[in-house]
Amino acid sequence: MSEPVPVERPVLQLRLVVEAEDYDAAVAFYRDVLGLPEQAAFEGVGDARVAILEAGRATLEIANPAQKRMIDEIEVGRPTAPGVRVAFEVTDAQAMTDRLVTAGATLVAPPVETPWRSLNARLGGPAGLQITLFQELETLDERRDKSGFGTDRERHED
């Protein structure tokens, strides 16, 4: 069993680094269309460029193969996601889906309500990213007492 997380957390930020062949198009899509504010940008030798976009609160979602297959089935109806899929919580999944598709994203599957009460859409975005847009339809507190919700630690307590 793993050690409990200390009160003072050692990790301060999760940063997902994505290589984009068409850097300008990817930055414009994620910054200007999806609306992720630019925190910083740097240039280096040999046309090296990077933009760091603020994406709000970050979490690392670890799923086993069965969960990945289930999510693909719910959101898309077939296996589709690569090993990494980027999910963005939005306030209006349908409106943001429409906005991103208009800007060039590929619609993989339109918004669908999930068993855990979120509205999820799947898109193909620049830099080869598969994107889930999700809109929460209930708060964590509203879900807490429902079957299947909680934490792994709660489910495996002796």
Residue ranges and their predicted role:
Residues 1-27, 84-88, 136-158:
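N-terminal beta-strand motif that seeds the catalytic metal site of vicinal oxygen chelate
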Residues 20-24, 79-130:
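Vicinal oxygen chelate
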Residues 8-10, 17-60:
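Core segments of cupin and vicinal oxygen chelate
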Residues 4, 72-76:
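Short, P/G- and charge-enriched loop/turn segments at secondary-structure junctions
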Residues 53-56, 123-126, 136:
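Active-site beta-strand termini and strand-to-loop segments that position acidic
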Residues 17, 37-45, 112, 134-144:
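Conserved catalytic-core motifs of GNAT/GCN5-like acyltransferases
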Residues 64-70, 135-138:
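Acetyl-CoA-dependent GNAT
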Residues 56-60, 66-69, 92-95:
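Short, charged/polar surface micro-motifs in flexible loops or helix N-caps
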